[in-house]
């Protein structure tokens, strides 16, 4: 069985890890970095760039450089959060035919899972380069507060990237695994505060140790899937734009190129202000008007940044209270607080969390790598490489159905340990009713329409009977990935209907298969291109070396042979300009055949040179001992 890799598919950065013996190892990508920016760019000449190369060209290609796609995955276009992003993102977010949030890239409609798959492909390639073997299986992490549609869409992204997603696990749980495995302690209750690039989660996790086996049980989870570092960046960008407008009278929001430069500068300034009290945002030639070029030079203090984002940090505190309440615990019951996600490096975030829990958060967990390490550990658990670890996760939101009067009736309440199964018997609302519609919902609101609709199906063929008489058993079954399967059965007739909640904001099987085929086709064309380049290089080398040999052979090469070689060289040169690998190889073969005589001459010349240099060395040895000693010394240095 091959390795199951662990992938942290982040909003801003992604990371991949594997189990190396008993230790999890974070892998470096082709650029030598342990994390990869979750940025995908589609260039004008049809190339797809992922990670640092995509980030580098963002300034000159803002409309086709896609970032923070995780904020859109599994979401509807009309969602309030998506509409907020529509107005601030430089790329184009559109509504798909099925109501999902998709993207328009160079006139082509693309689904978020399709784009996220490009990042996953890079993670897969990073692992394959390290292991030297194909990788087909992965554990991928998602925010604990992701709903069913978002989880399913993440699984779809894995499939499109050519990965069988063996398990979807929650990011805070993964971080707890990374933290808890190397701590030889007894029972502990920990709080994982995870503020990443686009999402926020809090999980309360109990680590129990019984006879050497560690059980990681999630007691409660809460969060906000649209709160993260990107929002902090946006606040700073808006401040800089407003200051520049006050100073110069120019609104940079109408200039995508300037906004892209500003985004990079704001992110850099935010990071610098975690260690410095003040920084300069200095962007020469940011724009120009009739009077000439304009430059931005604005001082930003840490206090200013904190005043801009204070409400965002406070927004993360409310879910902490709810999670503790759901777990039935108080602040004093928490032994350790772990910070995950790059945004937790901000001193103000650390201070607020410390104030809430009454203790300093731990600093020995790398906030960028902990989640990927935990995912790799879970991969090790699934392959049997990691023993004595049991992970008990929970469903983040209540699941139920719509019942008479538009009420949401929960079958599985939030923070129930998964996998789980629950059944309840319902009946008809009308006399002689022959069919019922099962409307599956996710959320905490009483009114059905205020919750997230996950899908609906009909159960037909109910025998005529007075209302309230038929017995319809509805069963909710959640698997270990947190994905829901629902069935309804008429106990009288035995008729049954089932549905797996395929992300209602997601892709159908046909669309996924097409994207998988496209990805495979791209991989094939990439491989062919690589082979073509290698053959071209070989042809180029042959061309150069043959010309040199013709020159050196001079008059020793018969005229007929020379003409044939010149003709073959010209044919190879033409073939090298084309895209046909077979044609290049054929012309190389032809050149080799007509160059037989040339090769003989080259070998003779080489043999003569060798003999000549041997004679010269012998003469030198006779003539002058001192020179010989110097010669020997130089040879030793070599």
UniProtKB/Swiss-Prot annotation:
It comes from Salmonella typhi. The modification Phosphothreonine is found at residue 199. GO terms for biological process: DNA replication. Disulfide bonds: none annotated. This is Chaperone protein DnaK. Signal peptide: none annotated. Residues 603-638 are annotated as: Disordered. Acts as a chaperone. The gene is dnaK. It comes from the Bacteria. GO terms for molecular function: ATP binding; ATP-dependent protein folding chaperone; unfolded protein binding. Keywords: ATP-binding, Chaperone, DNA replication, Nucleotide-binding, Phosphoprotein, Stress response. Belongs to the heat shock protein 70 family. Autophosphorylated; GrpE inhibits the autophosphorylation. Pfam families: HSP70. The keyword Oxidoreductase does not apply. Coiled coil: none annotated. Induction: By stress conditions e.g. heat shock. Residues 603-620 have a biased composition (Low complexity).
